[in-house]
């Protein structure tokens, strides 16, 4: 008999969670249901769960996810990215993403790839909060969410735009690494043939637990598939339900439709985006560029960077002892992220309270042939 992934914790699992808390103090602010989700995703493997949770907490801190509701996304994302949070027949959240309706080329000429990814993570975090609220109501240790992608109006740009392909792939990787056992189902509706071919081509990067959740019904069956998981009387008519809001079948108070070509007034001119920069360097193929910083008191490390072509990796390391000779011996405080940054600069910051040596790494080690010309600004200010 199959056991539900959201079943109550066994006595062994409860003890394992206590043991995890004793050696991973970083998870003190995570509830038991949250930790249980990770433990079950790792099939009870203690060391793997502990290491994954440490990395996850570092990721959440670096991306400021615990304060994501305080983040103000770029106006362009709010205006043109359609999504909404609804519920299934049992009141569990459904995140609807109107991915097909997005002008991906215009969007990524207007906002940083980091902000597009963060905007998507913010929606996922909202869904997670709703799951936690539902778990309190249901008495289960945690709840799961359904993700619906509507590909209506999808164009060849979704597959040919290099910046979007890179950003979306990064988003998928981050989701798989940091939101295990979070989804009940992934429903992809109104998918044309080219989308089905594209999906087949990306299955190589999808982990098996994710691929098992994916359902891509035919054009004639997608409404039926939705009807199996939602109350049609509480579901917008535009997506197969019976609900109309003030004559509008899209129910705009529930789903932000977005869409349309991004106005050129939002476009960033790459030649002017970083007219004032402190440093210019070339990171050769197979090489890295390292910047060492001495932090003497609690500080905020801020950065802005962009390349003249393609992507570049970025990571921040902390040398606890002050005597490490290799990056691999240091503690990662900002996890590695590889982003397209040719059109719009990447901007970010990290607050650090531990004094000592920090190393900012720009990585082009993965490239066999292409050198990257890199412009960047680094600032340090007291907290």
From Swiss-Prot:
Keywords carried by this UniProt record: Cytoplasm
Main location, first listed in the record: cytoplasm
A Gene Ontology cellular-component term: cytoplasm
One of the protein's GO biological processes: regulation of basement membrane organization
Domain GOLD span(s) in chain numbering: 271-380
Keyword Cytoplasm annotated: yes
Any Pfam family: CRAL_TRIO
The protein, known as: Protein ctg-1
The organism of origin for this protein: Caenorhabditis elegans
């Amino acid at each position: 008999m199959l056991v539900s992934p959201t079943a109550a914790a066994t006595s062994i699992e409860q003890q394992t969670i206590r043991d995890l808390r004793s050696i991973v103090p970083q998870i003190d602010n995570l509830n038991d249901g949250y930790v249980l989700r990770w433990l079950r995703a790792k099939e009870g493997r203690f060391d793997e769960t502990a290491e994954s949770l440490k990395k996850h907490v570092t990721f959440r801190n670096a991306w400021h996810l615990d304060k994501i509701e305080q983040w103000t996304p770029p106006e362009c994302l709010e205006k043109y990215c359609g999504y909404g949070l609804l519920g299934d027949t049992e009141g569990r959240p459904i995140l609807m993403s109107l991915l097909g309706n997005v002008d991906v080329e215009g969007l990524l000429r207007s906002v940083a790839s980091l902000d597009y990814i963060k905007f998507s993570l913010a929606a996922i975090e909202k869904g997670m909060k709703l799951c936690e609220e539902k778990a309190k109501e249901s008495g289960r240790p945690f709840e799961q969410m359904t993700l619906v992608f509507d590909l209506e109006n999808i164009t060849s740009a979704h597959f040919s735009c290099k910046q979007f392909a890179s950003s979306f792939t990064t988003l998928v990787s981050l989701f798989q690494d940091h939101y295990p056992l979070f989804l009940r189902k992934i429903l992809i509706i109104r998918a044309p043939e080219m989308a089905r071919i594209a999906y087949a081509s990306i299955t190589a990067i999808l982990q098996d637990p994710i691929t098992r959740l994916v359902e891509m019904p035919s054009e004639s069956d997608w409404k039926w598939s939705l009807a199996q998981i939602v109350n049609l009387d509480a579901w917008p008519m535009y997506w197969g339900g019976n609900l109309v809001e003030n004559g509008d079948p899209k129910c705009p108070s529930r789903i932000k439709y977005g869409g349309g070509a991004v106005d050129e007034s939002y476009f960033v001119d790459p030649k002017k985006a970083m007219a004032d920069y402190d440093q210019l360097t070339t990171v050769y193929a197979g090489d890295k560029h390292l910047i060492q910083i001495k932090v003497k008191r609690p500080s905020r490390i801020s950065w802005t960077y962009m390349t003249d072509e393609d992507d570049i990796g970025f990571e921040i390391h902390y040398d606890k002892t002050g005597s490490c000779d290799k990056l691999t011996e240091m503690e990662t405080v900002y996890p590695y992220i590889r982003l397209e940054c040719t059109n719009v600069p990447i901007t970010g910051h990290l607050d650090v309270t531990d004094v000592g040596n920090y190393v900012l790494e720009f990585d082009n080690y993965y490239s066999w042939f292409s050198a990257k010309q890199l412009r960047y600004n680094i600032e340090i200010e007291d907290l």
